[in-house]
Amino acid sequence: MGRNAEFGTGRPIENHKHTIDSQTMKFLLLTPPLTQLNTPYPATTVLKGFLQMHKHQVAQADLGIDLVLGIYNRRFLQRLFASTGNPVGKPGMQRIYANHDRYVACVDDVVRFLQGKDATLAPRIANRTLLPEGPRFDNMADLEWAYGTSGTDDRARYLATLFIEDIADYIRETTAPYFDLIRYAEHLAAYAPEFDEMEAALNAQTTIVDHLLIDILSQHILACNPDVVGFAVPFPGCLYAALLCGKWVKDNYPGTKVVIGGGFANTEWRSLAEERLFKYTDFVVIDDGELPLLRLAKYLNNEIDATQLVRTYYLENNAIRYSGNDAENIPFAEGGTPCFEGLEMGRYLSMAEVTNPMHQLWSNGKWNKMMLSHGCYWAKCAFCDTCLDYIARYDAPTAQQAVDRMADIMRQTGQSGFHFVDEAMSPQLLKNVSTELINRQMTVSYWGNIRFEKAYNAELCNLMADAGCIAVSGGLEVASNRLLKLMNKGVSIEQTVNAARNFTNAGIMVHTYLMYGFPTETLQETINALEVVRRMFDEGIVQSAFWHRYAMTAHSPSGREPEKYGAVRTTFEPNPFCNNEVDFDYDFDYDIEAVGEGLKFATYNFMNGLGLDRPLRKWFRIKVPNPKI
C-alpha cells in the first residue's frame, strides 16, 4: 500500500480548503510515537494552554497512546497473528505464536488492568494462571523477594508489563523492525549526521504499525480540520513517526501547514542545512515554541512578514532560510497554565518494567507533568548544553503562581501527583512551593530533578516531605571529586552523600544519575566511583541509579573547548542534518565498553539489594583494580 493510499478513514477530503480567520487559527498539536505510556508528555499541553490564551483554537493528541491502544486489542492482534503465521526460525516468537489465542483472549483485560479500570484482575494475573508467558518471563525478577505475599497489585503490574513487552518483541521481530514500546525507529535519529538512512526508511514499504499510525492521524485531522499541524518531537525515537505523519499531511492536505519543534530540534537542528527535510514539514521551530507558533499564526494570516518569525526555519526558492529573532521569548510566568483537554488520563497505562519502586516512577503513575521553572539555575556543567536556551535561561515564577498552576491542573486531570520536569529545581523555589502547599492544605505528591546542594539539610527535606515530595533525582555523575571539579559540577561527593541521607531520613526516595568515560577519567577513578555508589546503596541513602556514558555535544563547554578537558574534537564542520553529539579523541588505556557493562551490571544488582558484599572486580569481565577510598 502506498503512502497516499486510502485506508480506514484516511481518505483525503476532496477540494479541502481553509478559510483562515484573521484573528484565529486552528492548531492540531501532536506528540508522535513514542514517549511514555503512563502519562502525557508535557509539550503540547503547554502550547495549547498558551495559544488558547491568544484566542486560537487548539486540539491536541498523543499519537503514542493512540497507537499502543490501537495495537493492544483483540482485533489488531488477530490481524497480526493471521498476517505473520508461525514465524519459522525464531523459537522465542514461535513460543508466543503457539499461544496466540491466549494473547488475543487476554489483551483487552490486561490493558484495562494497567489503565486502573479493573483492579480485581490483580490476583488472577499475580498467581500466574491467566497470562501466557513468552520469552520475557524467562528472566523476570524473583517475585517472592520483590513483592512477598502482600504486593499483589505490584506483582500483577510487573507480570502484565512482561506480557505487553512480549507482544512488542513479537511485532518487532515479525512485522515492524522499528517498533518499541517507548521509542519508534530511534536508531535512525540517535546519531544522524546525514538524512539518507532516515529518508530511505521513510520511503520503504510501510508496515502494519505505520498504516495504523496514519489511520489514527487521519481521524484526528478529520475531527478538527486544522490550519496547522504541529509535531512536538522530544526524542530521537519520535522523529521517524513525525516525518512519516508530516509527509502524509503535506501530500493529502496541501492547504494545511506542518511544523516540527521540540527537544530534538532544539539540540540537533541549530545548523540545519538539509533541504530534503522540508518534504516532510513546512517549518521547523527551535527552543520554546510559544512565541514561534504565535508569530507563525500571524505570518500565515498575512499579518506579518517572514522577517518577524521567531527561531523558525522554512524553505524559500529551494533554499533554507532562518528567521532569527532568537532572543525574543515569553516570560515563564506569562505562559499560562498547561491545558490537558483532549488527553484523557484514564487511557494511559501504568507499567512496571522493573521491581525497584524508585525506578518505577518513570513508567508507573498518571503524573501531571509540568515545569516549576524554566532552565537551570546552575547551568555551568561541562557536559551539559549550557549555551542552549532550555538550559541557560533560568526563569522562575513565584511560589503562588506555581501552586496556582498545580491547582488548576489538578482540577483538569483529577490527579494529585506531579512530576516536575525542570532541568533542576532550586532549593529556594522548592522551599517556597512546599510552604505554599502546606499553607493551602493541598494534598499532592511530587518528585523531580534537583542538584545535591548543601541547602538540602534535614529541615528543608522534612518540609518538602510534609508538602508531598516523595522522590528526587540528581547527578552524582563521575563520583570523583577531581572530576566533579573539572566538569564544574558544583557539588562534591560529601555534600551529595549528606543531601541523599537527609532526603532518605525524611522518607524521600533518591535516584542518582551517574557517568563514566569523561576525558581523563582513569580506571581507578571509575572503580572508586562504583565503590561510592555501592556504599550509598548499602547505607540505604540511594534507592536507584543509572550509568550513562559521557557524550560530547556541540553545545556543551566540553564540546566547545575540548582541550580544557584533555580531549580533541575530530571535526568542527557542521553536518547537513543533525548536529549535537560530536566525535572526539581521547585514548582511554582500558576497555571502556567492558567497564560500562560492569558498572551497569553491578548497579542493577545493587538496586535490587543484591551483591552489596561482593568484591567489585567480580562484576567485570576484564581485570580491574580494587577500590582505593
Task: Indicate where each model-derived feature is located.
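Conserved SAM/AdoMet-binding glycine-rich loop
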Residues: L28-L34, V228, G255, V403-M509, ...
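Intrinsic disorder/low-complexity segments
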Residues: M1-T24
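N-terminal [4Fe-4S]-dependent radical SAM core
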Residues: M198-A201, V209, N318-K369
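Canonical Radical SAM [4Fe-4S] cluster-binding loop centered on the CxxxCxxC motif
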Residues: W362-Q400
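Flexible glycine/acidic-rich beta-alpha junction loops that bind and position SAM and/or redox cofactors
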Residues: Q60-Y72, A265-R270, E274, R482-M487, ...
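Catalytic cores of alpha/beta
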Residues: L272, L460-C461, T520-R535
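A cross-taxonomic marker for long C-terminal extensions/tails that follow the last structured domain
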Residues: Q308, F577-I629
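Glycine-rich beta-alpha loop elements in corrinoid/cobalamin-binding modules
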Residues: K26, L34-L37, P42-Q78, G85, ...
